Amino acid sequence: MDYDPNTNPFDLHFSGKLPKREVSASASKVVEKKWLVKDEKRNMLQDEINRVNSENKKLTEMLARVCEKYYALNNLMEELQSRKSPESVNFQNKQLTGKRKQELDEFVSSPIGLSLGPIENITNDKATVSTAYFAAEKSDTSLTVKDGYQWRKYGQKITRDNPSPRAYFRCSFSPSCLVKKKVQRSAEDPSFLVATYEGTHNHTGPHASVSRTVKLDLVQGGLEPVEEKKERGTIQEVLVQQMASSLTKDPKFTAALATAISGRLIEHSRT
């Protein structure tokens, strides 16, 4: 019997050679799989962030368009509400085409009636909106006009197209009388206050107006006659001249009209 000195006599299963130590491949596969899962989750999160950013950008652009449309509609509404003011004469003139333009030309060339009264103003009967112009000192910031009626002020704000604030009034007979008015200094001619009236008074004014304005009905194509007042003089002439100067800034529309009104008012006031 051969004896091997390297043999452990107590190890019954010893084959005579030590096994090599090997690293398990399954452990490395598990680690690699975990990294792949993490990379996949990171990519998914990145895609989600990109999607949210893209959606946020679209919503921001949509909100900007909505705001632009809102401001455009708001400006249009204010322009329509004050379309009889000096600032909007040019806008209305551009809208006059065809038959309406012909009627306006016939009105300018026809004899013009005269009107001197407390709040007889440029009137649109269809919209029940009238506008009056009152001469005022540039230093006067009260935005109050003497039109023969009593009013209660309920608000004031700054508009986009005029540095002067706009004041809001209700008739003192409210709620039985629902007439409202807005008063703002003219942006083109600061020597005038522009009063826009909404509605018709269902009562007479408590006081007669000291100032005189001109009533011009652009819908009917003429000046509406009213009761002539006894008080006439230099105040009326100055007011007429100032109105003519303001209107004649648009030579295409108002030159002939302003000249005719100015001449006839001055001629009548001197008689």
Curated annotation (Swiss-Prot):
**DNA-binding region(s), chain positions:** 140-206
- Cite the SUPFAM superfamilies for this sequence: WRKY DNA-binding domain (SSF118290)
MF terms from GO for this chain are: DNA-binding transcription factor activity; identical protein binding; sequence-specific DNA binding
Q: Which SMART domains match?
A: WRKY
Give UniProt keywords alphabetically.
Answer: DNA-binding, Nucleus, Transcription, Transcription regulation
InterPro entries reported in the protein's UniProt record = WRKY_dom, WRKY_dom_sf, WRKY_plant
- Principal place of residence: nucleus
According to its UniProt entry, the function of this protein is described as:
Transcription factor. Interacts specifically with the W box (5'-(T)TGAC[CT]-3'), a frequently occurring elicitor-responsive cis-acting element.
Q: What is this protein called?
A: Probable WRKY transcription factor 60
The source organism is Arabidopsis thaliana
Q: Which gene encodes it?
A: WRKY60
